[in-house]
Amino acid sequence: MKLLFPVFASLMLQYQVNTEFIGLRRCLMGFGRCRDHCNVDEKEIQKCKMKKCCVGPKVVKLIKNYLQYGIPNVLNEDVQEMLKPAKNSSAVIQRKHILSVLPQIKSTSFFANTNFVIIPNATPMNSATISTMTPGQITYTATSTKSNTKESRDSATASPPPAPPPPNILPTPSLELEKAEEQ
């Protein structure tokens, strides 16, 4: 239900296609009714051709509760403090404060589920990135630096070629016949 509710709420808040041509006198994904006038406890959300789309108090309460409690507050107090300009403080104190607050922030961005790898003591080198892309499959990216490729080329030329496999003697029908005659 938690996964479907954001989709449901976003669809409810967008302009919906009129379903009146099918014969249904409903609007807003079936949660509202097309009427000439809304009742006292109902609210008008959108238009159904020449009529009003009226939504009952339960649906209004459902939407309000979702908007109030269902959507997490991205900008909580700590983030708002972090965004304010600091007075009489050094950059080190600001950095320590930001680093202490970062684990508490829940990110809702596109990169929230992306894993990042940080390599300490990395030296900048010329690198070549090779990306393999096949439609409908996972993309794998291989990155090799100049020094790594040179080492691998040198090691490939320095190593001796593999020994050929021992020759397999396959029995021929004539040899089998000779052995059978000897017995």
From Swiss-Prot:
Keywords: Antibiotic, Antimicrobial, Defensin, Disulfide bond, Secreted, Signal. GO terms for cellular component: extracellular region. Its main location: secreted. Residues 1-19 form the signal peptide. Has antibacterial activity. It is found in: Secreted. Residues 141-183 are annotated as: Disordered. This is Beta-defensin 129. Disulfide bonds join 27-53, 34-48, 38-54. The gene is DEFB129. It comes from Pongo pygmaeus (Bornean orangutan). Residues 159-170 have a biased composition (Pro residues).
